[in-house]
Design a protein with these regions (language model features):
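Asp-based, Mg2+/Mn2+-dependent phosphohydrolase catalytic module
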Residues: 1-6, 105, 109, 116-251
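N-terminal helical cap/lid subdomain that shapes the substrate entry/recognition surface
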Residues: 2-102, 113
């Protein structure tokens, strides 16, 4: 694909720019130790993933801290250990503390020299504001679950994204969506007819982590392992005529 053929990039934030699995595990692991569960971070994240997606589906207007707390409590029920209010609040309040991936800030700064950058995220505004202190990026637009009253993979974010593109004077065909989660992003991006890049942050680990396995069709146009790889590929594309091939695997 020719990365120089696009004018804007829309990003999922958590899992793509911010290491939400590390942030969630930083609460789940000490809780498991306290309640006597001999489970590592990967197994805890796998137990948690479906619960968060279920809460988001059933309560689309719930604030994200509330989603986190409720999903944590349900995970405790699944694992046979209660989650107290203090632990639930600890996870719910933790979003601003979740770390950025090491390459995110520099890659965004580089990509911003070529594209308008937009955020399409399953979070609340205050949570993203805290996260952007780690990313240090001026985005052309930020679309959150709080703004659209729903959580991906529902299509609300992408409908709002298209309205934003109209305001920015950018055609849909000039937008490339960039995300890690097949479930949350590449399924609805396919439905919306968007080209997309899969940032496969879990390329060196088995399983799905904090993200459910997708049950609907998904596709992507390019797979990369990091945001740094995308920034380097964009620099190369804008420096010369050669594009970068990389077909995805349609489901």
């Amino acid at each position: 694909m020719d990365l120089a053929g696009y004018k804007a990039l829309s990003f999922d934030c958590y899992g793509t720019l911010i290491d939400w699995e590390a942030g969630i595990a930083a609460v789940l692991v000490p809780w498991a130790d306290e309640v006597g569960l001999d489970l590592d971070a990967e197994r805890l994240l796998a137990a948690y993933a479906g619960n968060e997606a279920e809460v988001e589906r059933d309560h689309p207007s719930a604030p994200y801290p509330e989603v986190l707390a409720t999903a944590f409590r349900r995970t405790g029920e699944t694992l046979g250990r209660p989650v107290g209010d203090a632990w639930a609040r600890r996870l719910g309040d933790s979003v601003p503390d979740w770390p950025a991936f090491p390459d995110s800030a520099a890659a965004l700064a580089s990509l911003a020299t070529h594209y308008a950058l937009l955020i399409v995220s399953n979070v609340h505004r205050a949570g993203f504001a805290g996260s952007n202190r780690h990313l240090r990026c001026r985005f052309a637009a930020v679309i959150t679950a709080e703004d659209v009253g729903a959580y991906k993979p529902a299509g609300n974010h992408f409908r709002a994204l298209f309205d934003t593109l109209d305001e920015l004077g950018i055609a849909r065909g000039e937008l490339l969506h960039v995300a890690q989660s097949l479930f949350h992003d590449h399924v609805p991006a396919r439905k919306a007819g968007l080209a997309s890049v899969w940032i496969n942050r879990r390329h060196d680990r088995p399983g799905w982590g904090a993200t459910p396995e997708p049950s609907e069709a998904w596709s992507y146009d390019l797979e990369l392992r990091s945001l740094a790889e995308l920034a380097a590929a964009a620099d190369a594309a804008f420096a010369g005529p050669a594009g970068l091939p990389g077909p995805g695997r349609p489901a």
